[in-house]
């Protein structure tokens, strides 16, 4: 069996590594470098260039040289981030027939996984040249905040490149593996991995523990921004240069694709130089021409100017750090080490901001360009069975649940739950003699289901006719190690079952993930009010149902006046529940009123029960009715009412 290689498929650069025994080897490519630019050029003669050769010719072939394609992988064309990139990229971003964002080169439509596969193919060939044998299996890393769609697209890219992707793992987790196995420190440690790459930002809080000689890596929480990275820093420099040139020369370079490609190259170079110098000069002769002749660009940029241009981008990385610390249930002072990953973390301003937030200097002994590939190689060795002393426990980034009565999102699996995981909960019907239920599966952090992402729905049919609340329907959520969700529903009485797999292409887009979390925070108060209103309506519905049932059985034992009072209060509550504009206070008042006037009915029921000395089951049923009639809240043996619709049959 061949070796499982580890690949860091980056937005800007990619890297491949393997394990030789317990020693890691980051492999040099055919150009002699340990990282490869994630750039692909499609030439006139159908040749495809990858890496440094593609980068070298990009200025003369801007429309057919593709870079930062990882920002498009698994995305829909209509997303605002994609729309933003359309105006910035020299190559064409187009809408595919299925609504995804694709690219175009020489008039040919290309899917992002297809383009990324060229980079993976180069990584595969690099490993094969070193090993002298075919390579067919790989562990590929993705940003921790990548959604299922993006993960599946990355797996597809691997398959196109001729690789069986044994596992997709998160970049910060891979970096933690590389760090943890390289250090001699003993004892449990909590580390923060701050990963600012070319196109994405992630932060993960990870606990490294020594458990009976086995190194255990447990992700406590993760957060991030999947559209923030070095490309955005470059763009700030490009925009600044364009603005300055327009002021001086009166020419707008943003419409000139050849000039844009030269500016992109110069901006990246200037940014790198300013990490070690206080000032740099951008000198681009013959950048453009007009009626008066050729124009030359010459501009000095200081480190202070660059820091001013990108200050808000650096600041944007801090809020995810704050949320990750909170979600992990730790304090900043509990963090033993801060690991920097991604080339953009070489910027002094970034390091300064990280130190300011975490209160300690980040580690300098981790290579930010290679750590992720090294971690992927270690995981490959674990999966091949050659390494037994490492256990990796990762998490799911967003909560999963189903819609229940009143449109409430009832969470089955909370965000940052260790995967693989499985959870089951018993629900029931909302109407008498309901023969079918519809299970709606959602993902997100909002309290009301409508504010979250609908992943899918399915029916469970053939439920025997029963009063509402009697059938017991067990819903099971199961997330496997690859992050794929399986959902099942089973009628416990009949054993009838239905299952679906929520496939990756049903997952969230990264923009939706970011928006959900922002929405959840911004709308927390409104969500809470809606949740409380739904709870009041549910309580009112239950009281109406039980009071009607009690009146049918015991109403003739009441005085006419008492019965009329109950019926009037009952109608008043029903009217309030039908009124869509009724607020929580109005419904609660009607519930209280019906509870008060129903006390006599409850007393009659109780007296009748005592007199008859009914059997235990019958007594329990009557007591349940009395509790409802008296306005008490009923807890139905942990069975949650779920909002289900009748499935009509032809």
Swiss-Prot record:
Check the record and name the InterPro entries matching this protein: ATPase_NBD (IPR043129), Chaperone_DnaK (IPR012725), Heat_shock_70_CS (IPR018181), HSP70_C_sf (IPR029048), HSP70_peptide-bd_sf (IPR029047), Hsp_70_fam (IPR013126)
Tell whether ATP-binding is among the UniProt keywords: yes
Q: Which residues carry this modification: Phosphothreonine?
A: 200
- Family per similarity comment: Belongs to the heat shock protein 70 family.
Protein's UniProt name: Chaperone protein DnaK
* UniProtKB keywords: ATP-binding, Chaperone, Nucleotide-binding, Phosphoprotein, Stress response
User: What taxonomic classification does the UniProt entry list for its organism?
Assistant: Bacteria, Pseudomonadati, Pseudomonadota, Betaproteobacteria, Burkholderiales
Give the induction text: By stress conditions e.g. heat shock.
Q: Which HAMAP family match?
A: DnaK (MF_00332)
| The species this protein was found in | Burkholderia ambifaria (strain ATCC BAA-244 / DSM 16087 / CCUG 44356 / LMG 19182 / AMMD)
Looking up Pfam families in the UniProt record yields:
HSP70
Skewed-composition ranges (Low complexity) = 612-636
């Amino acid at each position: 069996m061949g070796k499982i290689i580890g690949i860091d498929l980056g937005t800007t650069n990619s890297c491949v590594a393997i394990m030789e025994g317990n020693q890691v080897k980051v492999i040099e490519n055919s150009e002699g470098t340990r990282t490869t630019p994630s750039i692909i050029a499609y030439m006139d003669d159908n040749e495809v260039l990858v890496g440094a050769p593609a980068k070298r010719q990009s200025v003369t072939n801007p429309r057919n040289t593709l870079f930062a394609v990882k920002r498009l992988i698994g995305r829909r064309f209509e997303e605002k981030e994609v729309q933003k990139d359309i105006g910035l990229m020299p190559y064409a971003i187009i809408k595919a027939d299925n609504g995804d964002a694709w690219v175009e080169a020489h008039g040919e439509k290309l899917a992002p996984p297809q383009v990324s596969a060229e980079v993976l193919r180069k990584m595969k060939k690099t490993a094969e040249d070193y090993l002298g044998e075919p390579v067919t299996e790989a562990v590929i890393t993705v940003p921790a905040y990548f959604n299922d769609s993006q993960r599946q697209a990355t797996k597809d890219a691997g398959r196109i490149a001729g690789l069986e992707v044994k596992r997709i793992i998160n970049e910060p987790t891979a970096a933690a593996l590389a760090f943890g196995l390289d250090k001699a420190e003993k004892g449990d440690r909590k580390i923060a991995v701050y990963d600012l790459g070319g196109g994405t930002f992630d932060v993960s809080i990870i606990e490294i523990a020594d458990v009976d000689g086995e190194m255990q890596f447990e992700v406590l929480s993760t957060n991030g921004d999947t559209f923030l990275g070095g490309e955005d820093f470059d763009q700030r420099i490009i925009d600044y240069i364009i603005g300055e040139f327009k002021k001086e020369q009166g020419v707008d370079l943003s419409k000139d694709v050849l000039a844009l490609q030269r500016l992109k190259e110069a901006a990246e170079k200037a940014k790198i130089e300013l990490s070690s110098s206080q000032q740099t000069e951008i000198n681009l002769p013959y950048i453009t021409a007009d009626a008066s002749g050729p124009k030359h660009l010459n501009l000095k940029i200081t480190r202070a100017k660059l820091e001013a241009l990108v200050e808000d981008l650096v600041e944007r990385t801090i809020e995810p750090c704050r949320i990750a610390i909170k979600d992990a249930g730790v304090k900043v002072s509990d963090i033993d080490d801060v690991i920097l990953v991604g080339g953009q973390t070489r910027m002094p301003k970034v390091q300064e901001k990280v130190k300011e937030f975490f209160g300690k200097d980040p580690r300098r002994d981790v290579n930010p360009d290679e750590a992720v590939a090294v971690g992927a190689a270690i995981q490959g060795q674990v999966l091949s069975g050659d390494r037994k002393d490492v256990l990796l426990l990762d998490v799911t980034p967003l909560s999963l649940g189903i819609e229940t009565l009143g449109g409430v999102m009832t969470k089955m699996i909370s965000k940052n739950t260790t995967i693989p995981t499985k959870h089951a909960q018993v629900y029931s019907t909302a109407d008498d003699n309901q023969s079918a239920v519809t299970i709606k599966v959602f993902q997100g952090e909002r309290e009301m289901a409508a504010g979250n992402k609908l992943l899918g729905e399915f029916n469970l049919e053939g439920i025997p006719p029963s009063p509402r609340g009697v059938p017991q329907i067990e819903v099971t959520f199961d997330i496997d190690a690859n992050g794929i969700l399986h959902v099942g529903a089973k009628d416990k009485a009949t054993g009838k079952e239905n299952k679906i797999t929520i496939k990756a292409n049903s997952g969230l887009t990264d923009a939706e993930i970011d928006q959900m979390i922002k929405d959840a925070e911004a709308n927390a108060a409104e969500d809470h009010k809606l949740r409380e209103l739904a709870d009041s309506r549910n309580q009112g519905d239950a009281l109406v149902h039980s009071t009607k049932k009690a009146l049918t059985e015991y109403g003739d034992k009441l005085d006419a006046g008492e019965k009329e009072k109950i019926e009037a209060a009952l109608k008043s509550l029903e009217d309030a529940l039908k009124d869509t504009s009724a607020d929580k206070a109005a419904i609660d008042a009607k519930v209280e009123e019906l509870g008060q006037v129903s006390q006599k009915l409850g007393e009659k029921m109780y007296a009748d029960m005592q007199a008859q000395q009914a059997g235990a089951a019958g007594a329990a049923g009557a007591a349940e009715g009395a509790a409802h009639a008296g306005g008490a809240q009923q807890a139905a043996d942990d069975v949650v009412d779920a909002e289900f619709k009748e499935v009509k049959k032809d």
